[in-house]
Amino acid sequence: MSRSSKKGPYVDVRLLGRIEELNRANEKRVLRTWSRDSTIFPQMVGHTIAVHDGRRHVPVYITENMVGHKLGEFAPTRLFRGHGGKKVDKRGKMK
């Protein structure tokens, strides 16, 4: 279920403040954040934000197409290694 429209989009106040500070200084650097639930605002376009995936920080370069999405959508938390099946050795032969 999506957030109520009367509340408006959520963004971490500290993260938005750091982005605006970088915009004023006309500076680009990687910002680390644990706030996966923050909505991407137009002020963030052009910045690289390292989003925590539970294990490490994944660098995400923000583009115009990402505005309105959540930061966590671009840093997957699970690694899919494929379904079980027949084992294949390094030379491509079945065991």
Curated annotation (Swiss-Prot):
Keywords: Ribonucleoprotein, Ribosomal protein, RNA-binding, rRNA-binding
Domain of life: Bacteria
BP-aspect Gene Ontology terms: ribosomal small subunit assembly; translation
The keyword Transmembrane helix is assigned to this record: no
Entry annotated with the keyword Ribosomal protein: yes
GO molecular function: rRNA binding; structural constituent of ribosome
Pfam families documented for this protein: Ribosomal_S19 (PF00203)
Stored InterPro entries: Ribosomal_uS19 (IPR002222), Ribosomal_uS19_bac-type (IPR005732), Ribosomal_uS19_CS (IPR020934), Ribosomal_uS19_SF (IPR023575)
SS bond list: none
This protein's GO CC annotations: cytoplasm; small ribosomal subunit
Family: Belongs to the universal ribosomal protein uS19 family.
Reported function: Protein S19 forms a complex with S13 that binds strongly to the 16S ribosomal RNA.
Protein name: Small ribosomal subunit protein uS19
Lineage: Bacteria, Bacillati, Chloroflexota, Chloroflexia, Chloroflexales
Gene name tied to this protein: rpsS
